[in-house]
A protein has these predicted regions:
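Function-determining sites in protein domains
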Residues: 3-10, 15-149
Length: 149
């Protein structure tokens, strides 16, 4: 009897492991506290306004800051290595985009969401981070109304 219980348990464990391996997209809750990104440093590189984080070399602004939309889009350079914060099933990054959300009428950062494309499964996955709000707020005040180069 114990032998059958062991065999059935083993089959269930193997089936569960296989189903987890076949998942193509890793979903994360908004504003995940466990993110490795805890600080944003604003820098300028070759005329592009960039955000340097602990996970990526640089992120280039591709959309003007628009108060009416209460958001700004950033994009990273391609062919970045995947980081552990994206989950164990992600092996590579083809591209990354970041959108920051703000409260109406004021450049107070209230959220941020990134989406990344992994060529291993041809799917977009989403993850969100906490940022250094004060640093990015100062950046917005300094660059408000300026166009991207």
């Amino acid at each position: 009897m114990k032998k059958w219980i062991f065999i059935i348990s083993l089959i269930i464990i193997i089936a569960t492991a296989l189903s987890l391996c076949n998942q193509k997209t890793v979903q994360y809750p908004l504003m995940q506290k466990e993110s490795a990104i805890t600080q944003i440093d604003i820098v300028e590189i070759s005329g592009y306004r960039t955000v340097s984080t602990g996970n990526f070399d640089s992120i280039r602004v591709i959309k003007n800051i628009d108060p009416s939309e209460n958001s700004v889009f950033l994009t990273s350079f391609y062919n970045l290595p995947c980081k552990k914060s994206f989950g164990p099933s992600q092996e590579c990054l083809e591209g990354l985009a970041v959108r920051f959300f703000f409260q109406d009428g004021a450049f107070q950062l209230v959220g941020a969401e990134t989406s990344f494309y992994c060529s291993a499964d041809n799917n977009w996955s989403y993850i969100a981070y906490y940022f250094d709000y004060d640093a990015f707020h100062q950046y917005l005040l300094q660059h408000k109304g300026q166009e991207d180069k």
